[in-house]
Amino acid sequence: INTVLPFGNTLSIVKVTGAELLEALEASTYCTPTSIGGFPQVSGIEFTVDTTKAYDQGEQYPGSTYYGPKSIQRVTIETVGGEPFDANATYTIATNDFMAAGGDTYYAFAAASVNYDLGLSMDEVVMDYITDELKGTVTEEAYGQPAGRITVDQGLAFTDVAATSPYYDGIEWA
């Protein structure tokens, strides 16, 4: 557990509008498909990142090396909690204290209407979940495949390949 949660973070709750959630996801996926440490790890939400569109970089977040989005171009949220996304709704997000304070690309969370650090160690919360909810077992069958919460649309990076090309069969298969 400490290998995947090495920073000693605590569990926080933030309440954000749909628009703030959308900003946070747009900012945290600004360089997708290139990876960064701040890429969102989500549950209870389904969204798409369209990497064929450029990130519309706005102002630099205060005290950060990251820039907020000037406009939302790449991210579309389909559902939150199994319900259609509403930019005007208020959503309750469980996250860590670093992100709740606006760390990495999550500056939108710092201004949340409710921002409360529960003081519970993230590694202990995850251990309790594995022990109590999963009865101590994490299986490949249950957790070994992507859950489909995040779709990354990369478009096609190449033009059509001629049927006479030696690569045609492999590309057609892919």
Task: Report the location of each language-model feature.
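N-terminal propeptides
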Residues: G155-A174
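Catalytic centers of hydrolytic enzymes
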Residues: I1-G155
